[in-house]
Amino acid sequence: MGLLKRAAGFAAAAVMASAIAFAAPKIDEPAIWTIQKPNGTTITLFGSVHLLPDGDGWRTKALKDAYEAADVIVMETDLTEMGNSDVANYLAKNSLNPPGVTLTKLLSPEQKATVEAAMDKAAMSFSSMEGYKPWFSAIQISVTYAVLQGFDPSQGVDKAIEADGKSDGKAFAYFEKVREQLDVFIELPEDEQITFLVLGAKEILTRPDEMEKLVTAWATGNVEEIDKLMNRGMEGSPRLARALLADRNARWTKEIGEFFMKDKNSYLIIVGAGHLAGDESVIAMLRDEGIEVEGP
């Protein structure tokens, strides 16, 4: 369920649903990476899962030490921007179909049947999404389904670290604006949006426990399994996969190499776990640049 899992965090704040129990895995040791900078300061990278069951067992000693040492915490985006009226208006403007266009009209009968069945699994009615574009419908299905499995959008690692950091007066930096993240989906051609929606619906129907598998892989530091679940599952929508993964990883790697490596600050970088797993991950790209990264 790589496509939808990776997309789920973008709309999580907008979802309201009743959660059922989820058997949370025992958190052993999520993967963590460290770069020793030439001046003696450090860069630590930790993968976030944007939707988690309740609990904070992921706060390992290594992560706590990195948090305490960090002069700056770096995250994908400032999550509080989702509450800004300009972002809300931008999302509303770009998530709705033009007048006279419905989701039914955009899908073939077979595609509609698949999407409707997935919406059933998520306790959603197809009619509730008729006015929305396929990309937004895909994310809504994913997040709602995850919440019904017991995952809480307010319990993500990134949100928890951001709340702690702001309470403790930590400095923050962000790789992207929320609008930049939304634009990844907004700028997809319509046919690619439909592919994204239908593939995600099929994944919910055929592999309903993928989110649980992802959290288990993350909780035990199984980077190879994270890559398999989150990144290799995106092959059905190559343009979206490139926009969500490789292109962004390359930009972040460049920023780390050109700026973070050269100043006197220690950094704690928190990004989605899928960005740190696989051949096109930030970790792999940093190593390709000759930067020594300690960790798996």
What are these regions (language model features)?
Residues S18-A19, K61, M285:
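Residues in and immediately flanking transmembrane alpha helices
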Residues P238-P296:
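A cross-kingdom marker for long, charged
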Residues A24, A31-L244:
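Structured, acidic catalytic/metal-binding patches in enzyme active sites
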Residues M1-A11:
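Bacterial N-terminal signal peptides that target proteins for export
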Residues V15-M16, W58, V282:
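Alpha-helical transmembrane segments and their juxtamembrane interfaces
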Residues A7, A14, V147-G150:
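Compositionally biased, intrinsically disordered low-complexity regions
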Residues G9-A21:
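Hydrophobic helical h-region of N-terminal Sec-dependent signal peptides
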